């Protein structure tokens, strides 16, 4: 009798994707983040679903409904904080996942990489709209400032902003549509993630050395399922430590004040995971220029495969490129810090220098250093 997992159509599909999948024998813990992102997505959908049962998308009751969830709903506080901090864990895993793709040259799988960039944009849009829903001061002003950036688009900008707002300012219509989009987008993300996996399984996984591993494959189960479970336990441990000991560590105190259109907070800033892009936006004095730089800071990932000049795929044996990569990481941390600081003397200059450095590393220095390495290795 044939094993059911190899004969049943549905089980066969799962088997080919997660059980008998041939995987390189040398992939490291950096390859755990894909499965962790899947877990984060499931966790966010489930906690979000339970929050949506009690939340009301109306400007007069949104803030109160979140308070009600935390105070009166059974275990509402833990669901709310798991959802809020789960978003932070999601972005930590996302940044690690993208960083791993850049370091080990996984971007040469162009279809998988491009779907990944689309996923990144969709997750960022979802997180932004989710931040608006509690209707605190930072929710309201964050929504006003970020949506207002679209007015920089020539000719259609103002009409576009008013169309998104559903009126002449961020109000009830805006909140209702943001809730609708925030609810539907995770399911679109799930579909895109399935396509991401589909393209990945067409080529097979990359590995740290960057060489073809067809001659040395091992089954995904039990080797990598066990490895992924360890990563999962560490993720849940970190998340629960955050939720149970300092749930507001990554939030903004201003968001505990109900939204007031008549009172602007002294310093408007988004969640920590958008601060690097926000710092790039603020470093350019021109509005349209800032918006373009903001979009390009993420969209630049799409041209990384075109700028790959090295004869080697991975950075594993390329010390110059490694130094440059870690400088890029340090630069992104600097931008994140600057994004959270007020717009005044030393921070403006640091932000501008860090922004120039960010684009210079990716567009100019990486290709040059890769070419130098080719000559040093006589390739």
Swiss-Prot record:
Q: Which GO terms describe its molecular function?
A: metal ion binding; ubiquinol-cytochrome-c reductase activity
What biological process terms from GO does the record include? mitochondrial electron transport, ubiquinol to cytochrome c
Major location (coarse): mitochondrion
Q: Which Pfam families match?
A: Cytochrom_B_C, Cytochrome_B
Record-linked PROSITE patterns? CYTB_CTER (PS51003), CYTB_NTER (PS51002)
> Which superkingdom is the protein from?
Eukaryota
Q: How is the cofactor bound?
A: Binds 2 heme b groups non-covalently.
Which cofactor(s) does the record list? heme b
Record: residues binding heme b b562: 83, 182
Kindly give the membrane topology term recorded for this protein: Multi-pass membrane protein
Is Transmembrane helix a UniProt keyword of this protein? yes
Provide the alphabetized UniProt keywords.
Electron transport, Heme, Iron, Membrane, Metal-binding, Mitochondrion, Mitochondrion inner membrane, Respiratory chain, Transmembrane, Transmembrane helix, Transport, Ubiquinone
Q: Where is this protein localized, as stated in its record?
A: Mitochondrion inner membrane
Q: Where does heme b b566 bind?
A: 97, 196
What's in the GO CC field?
A: mitochondrial inner membrane; respiratory chain complex III
Q: Can you tell me which residues bind a ubiquinone?
A: 201
Q: Which InterPro entries match?
A: Cyt_b/b6_C, Cyt_b/b6_C_sf, Cyt_b/b6_N, Cytb/b6-like_sf, Cytochrome_b, Cytochrome_b_C_euk/bac, Cytochrome_b_N_euk/bac, Di-haem_cyt_TM
Misc remark: Heme 1 (or BL or b562) is low-potential and absorbs at about 562 nm, and heme 2 (or BH or b566) is high-potential and absorbs at about 566 nm.
Which family does the entry's similarity section mention?
Answer: Belongs to the cytochrome b family.
Instruction: Give the quaternary structure.
Output: The cytochrome bc1 complex contains 11 subunits: 3 respiratory subunits (MT-CYB, CYC1 and UQCRFS1), 2 core proteins (UQCRC1 and UQCRC2) and 6 low-molecular weight proteins (UQCRH/QCR6, UQCRB/QCR7, UQCRQ/QCR8, UQCR10/QCR9, UQCR11/QCR10 and a cleavage product of UQCRFS1). This cytochrome bc1 complex then forms a dimer.
The role this protein plays is: Component of the ubiquinol-cytochrome c reductase complex (complex III or cytochrome b-c1 complex) that is part of the mitochondrial respiratory chain. The b-c1 complex mediates electron transfer from ubiquinol to cytochrome c. Contributes to the generation of a proton gradient across the mitochondrial membrane that is then used for ATP synthesis.
Instruction: Quote the protein name from its UniProt record.
Output: Cytochrome b
Say which species the protein is native to: Viverra megaspila
């Amino acid at each position: 009798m044939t094993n059911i997992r190899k004969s049943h159509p549905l089980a066969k599909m799962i088997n080919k994707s997660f059980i008998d999948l041939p995987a390189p024998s040398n992939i490291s813990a950096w390859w755990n983040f894909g499965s962790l992102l899947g877990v984060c997505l499931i966790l966010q959908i489930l906690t979000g679903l339970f929050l949506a049962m009690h939340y009301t998308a109306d400007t007069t009751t949104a803030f109160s409904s979140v308070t009600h969830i935390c105070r009166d709903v059974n275990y509402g506080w833990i669901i709310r904080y798991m959802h809020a901090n789960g978003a932070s864990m999601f972005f930590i895993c996302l940044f690690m996942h993208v960083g791993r793709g850049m370091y080990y040259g996984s971007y040469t799988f162009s279809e998988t990489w491009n779907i990944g960039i689309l996923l990144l944009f969709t997750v960022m849009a979802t997180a932004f709209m989710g931040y608006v829903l509690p209707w605190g001061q930072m929710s309201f002003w964050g929504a006003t400032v970020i949506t207002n950036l679209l007015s920089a688009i020539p000719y259609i900008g103002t009409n576009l902003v008013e169309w998104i707002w559903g009126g002449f300012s961020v109000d009830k219509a805006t909140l209702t549509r943001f809730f609708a989009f925030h609810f539907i987008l995770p399911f679109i993300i799930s579909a895109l993630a399935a396509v991401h996996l589909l393209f990945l399984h067409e080529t097979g996984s990359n590995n740290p050395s960057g060489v073809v591993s067809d001659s040395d494959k091992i089954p995904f189960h039990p080797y990598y399922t066990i490895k992924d479970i360890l990563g999962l336990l560490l993720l849940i441990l970190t998340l629960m430590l955050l939720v149970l000991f300092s749930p507001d560590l990554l939030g903004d105190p201003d968001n505990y004040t109900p939204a007031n259109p008549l009172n602007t907070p002294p310093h408007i800033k988004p969640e920590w995971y958008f601060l690097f892009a926000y710092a790039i936006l603020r470093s350019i004095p021109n509005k349209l220029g800032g918006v373009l730089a903001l979009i390009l800071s993420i969209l630049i990932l799409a041209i990384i495969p075109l700028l790959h000049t090295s004869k080697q795929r991975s950075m594993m044996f390329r010390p110059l490129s490694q130094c440059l990569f870690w400088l890029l990481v340090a630069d992104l941390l600097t931008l994140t810090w600057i994004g959270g600081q007020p717009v005044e003397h030393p921070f403006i200059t640091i932000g501008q220098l860090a922004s120039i450095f960010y684009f210079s590393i990716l567009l100019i220095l990486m290709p040059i250093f890769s070419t130098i390495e080719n000559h040093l290795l006589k390739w």
